[in-house]
Design a protein with these regions (language model features):
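Short, charged, surface-exposed interaction patches
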Residues: 2-245
């Protein structure tokens, strides 16, 4: 009868030990990979373009006053003709000019103003010019004093905005793809430089945010708005996270 070998427990112990070593190595590599995946750099890339407004909106408010409402209305009609003639003389197409709603104020209907001196009826009107020739609109707006010299009584008010024409850039979608590509490329350049400085290698993208497009005035100064300038700056900032290896 053959006796059981005493070597069997030794073999089992060796197998278990080797298994633990292999498992420990796998776990170690797992922790190493986890730490590596947590290493990343967040960078920003900026792209800018100078753009010229391609649309102008110019509200021209005016007013007439008289004790006779019919005469006040007649003055409004005459003023409308003068304004249109002025715009045509500046080389502008008035086919896109529209009249806003007519507003009439009867001062005698207001008990707080009934005793004040002045014309009874005040008629307000606004002519809104829409033009795809912003440069001509700007030039015409700088000669608005000629209308005053011709007897036109210009008005103002919060409903008409800050005064003067508004210049808009409407072709943003045409330049978006190229600007996003440029911003992303600059972000990658910054990340690559960081990786070199950190003696690491640049990995793939962890997360990306293209940012929001903003339109700014080209010449920034107190009291100067973007909508009041022909020349503008379009800017986008892309934020990208890259893994480091």
């Amino acid at each position: 009868m053959t006796e059981p070998s005493n070597r069997t427990p030794l073999y089992v112990a060796l197998i278990v030990a080797v298994g633990l070593v292999l498992a420990g190595g796998a776990i170690g590599r797992g922790f190493s990979d986890a730490r590596l995946s947590d290493r990343y750099v967040s960078v920003k890339g900026v792209a800018e373009r100078e753009a010229t407004a391609d649309l102008a909106l110019w509200p021209i408010p005016f007013v007439a006053a008289d004790d006779d409402l019919t005469l006040a209305q007649a003055r409004i009609n005459e003023t409308t003709k003068r304004i249109r003639a002025f715009l045509v003389a500046q080389g502008l197409d008035t086919s896109q000019a529209q009249l806003g709603s007519l507003r009439v104020t009867d001062r005698q209907a207001n008990p707080y103003q009934a005793g004040e001196a002045g014309r009874r009826f005040i008629v307000r009107q606004v002519l809104i010019l829409r033009s795809t020739e912003p440069a001509k609109v700007l030039a015409a707006s700088q000669r608005i004093g000629e209308l005053v010299q011709a007897g036109v009584v210009l008005s103002s008010g919060e409903e008409y905005g800050p005064g003067g024409p508004t210049f808009l850039f409407t072709k943003l979608n045409e330049i978006k793809p190229a600007m996003i590509a440029e911003a992303t490329s600059r972000a990658r350049e910054a990340a690559a430089q960081f990786a070199r400085d950190a003696q690491s290698k640049l990995g793939g993208i962890r997360q990306a945010n293209q940012g929001v497009f903003v339109i700014l005035p080209r010449d920034q100064a107190p009291g100067v708005s973007e909508e009041g300038q022909l020349q503008k700056i379009v800017r986008v900032v892309a934020t990208v996270d890259y893994y480091l290896r």
